[in-house]
Amino acid sequence: MSTQPLLPVLIVGAGPVGLTLACELSRHKVPFRLIEQADAPTLYSKAQILHSRTLELFEDLGLATRICEQARPARALNLCTRDWQRIVHVAVGEQDTAYPYMLNLSQRDLELLLAEHLASLGGVIERRVHLNSFEQKDDHVVCSLSHEGDRTETVMARYLIGCDGAHSTVRKGLGLPFIGDTYEWRLTQADVRIDWSIAQPTDEAVVFLSAQGPLAAFPLPGERRYRLIAFDAPEEPTLANFQKLMDERGPTGCRVSDPHWMVQFTIHCRQVERYRSGRALLCGDAAHIHSPVGGQGLNTGVQDAYNLGWKLGLVHHGIAKDALLDSYHEERHPVAATVLRSTDSATKGLGVLLKLSSDWAQHLRNGAMRFVSSLSMVQRAASRSLSELDVAYYKSPIVGQVQSMPWNRSGDDGHESPGLRDYFVFGDGPAPGARVPDVHFVSEQVDDRRLLPLLHGGQHHVLLFDGAAATPEGYRNLTRIADSLSPLYGDRFVCHIIVPSLERPEALIDWNGSLILDPRGELHRAFGARSECLYLIRPDGYVAFRSQPASGETLLDFLGQIFG
């Protein structure tokens, strides 16, 4: 038996969630080990859909382009009868994102891309390594590992992160109950070729409704490749049975062939009560599992890892205290709980609505679904929910704001006083805990510039606006705010002064930091910045803090409370 020195982070599980966390820790220069008991990436891809918000996160990691090159986009979801009559059409393209679609990519291919990216960052996956047990101490966790050949190892880690799936060894070792239910039916799916009886769009998914149950087909990379999914199919997953499912539930004359793999599994709806216990934390399926309706499980897990990674980075480097990690549970547990509720309702609804056997009941169902789904507000709500762009942390303990009432300011303290209209317009800007909008704006010679790429890199970003006033006094105040952050946080904070012109103001001639020109005011309007204000953006792209007027004192007070 060998014993290693104290390790900052031990990650158990090298699926998409564990790999995402490892990539994040690499970027934040946090030493870690990533262990996985399997000897190769998964073959059976239960997960396949990547939604808009997850793709934004992968863009930040530098992976989105490669993922998009290998994946197949789906820009709409259709519910149809067996004779191709469309009942519901949900478009996913009307979003404020560079990724207005669902991407279909097998979990195996995603794992391979993440593993390759991790290797480029110097990270290693230690395969055929199993976590046997662990014991928590005051300031570390003692972990017992087993390797091939009966070799054992003791690892002492400051933090143990369980990304080891639904049967998590870490969760079981913590004794946390996995609260919820198991559905009475099973899910059967396969990666197959489908020759449709009539030509179909290659960028749309379809669910066929029949008296025998639903049958879904999602486009995959490759010629005529699809993920074929059947709920409550009693037969074993064989090619003959998938053809039978198509004959019974899908359109006539369609041929299923060339399966790459086929699988059947039970689906659950479960979640732990807390994501952190001492120095052990849970991510992804180790913390929550639910029905695959909506394809949000993988996305929720990846976003768990993305939320936790930057916080571990700040704690490791001594910028923040250990208590910051408590916010991981406070922010991510409610998100998964909402997903569980919505997918549970949808799954149970499928069991009732989609298996109506009588013609009149099906006709009534189809008419009601067609009417409701045609409403623009329903379309937008469904699309936003699927994309996960509306995920927010409004009730998080680590977000906040300070906004002075217009009549409470004199304007003689170096700050510019907002008017009453300025006050209300600022209130309509992105609230603390909200995702930062990916604003398109014109700047210098660039006709279509995006905001989010300017906020990549894993740092906190401070957006400093002087509003419409654009006075020398206002700009001097903004530079003072930026200068006050530099001695405390160095390059972990990036300050951007945003000006409503095409030229650098004379008052900023000596400003060496980031200057964003916003001559048409797109950024100012998006952030409600009619007057002087600031926004602090977290490394994961959410608003941490905002103030009107821009105040370095209130910003530093906030950071002192959050980081400790």
Question: In which residue ranges do the predicted regions lie?
Answer:
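N-terminal Rossmann-fold NAD(P) dinucleotide-binding loop
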Residues: 18-19
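Core beta-strand elements of the Rossmann-like FAD/NAD(P) dinucleotide-binding domain
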Residues: 7, 149-159
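Conserved FAD-binding catalytic core of PHBH/FMO-like flavoproteins
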Residues: 69, 116, 159, 163-267
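FAD/FMN-dependent oxidoreductases across multiple families
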Residues: 70, 236-300, 320, 325, ...
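A conserved short coil-to-beta-strand element within the FAD-binding core of flavoproteins
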Residues: 127-141
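Glycine-rich FAD pyrophosphate-binding loop
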Residues: 26-46
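Helical substrate-recognition/capping region of FAD-dependent monooxygenase/halogenase enzymes
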Residues: 2-8, 12, 27-28, 81-84, ...
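Active-site-adjacent segment of FAD-dependent monooxygenases/related oxidoreductases
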Residues: 43-119
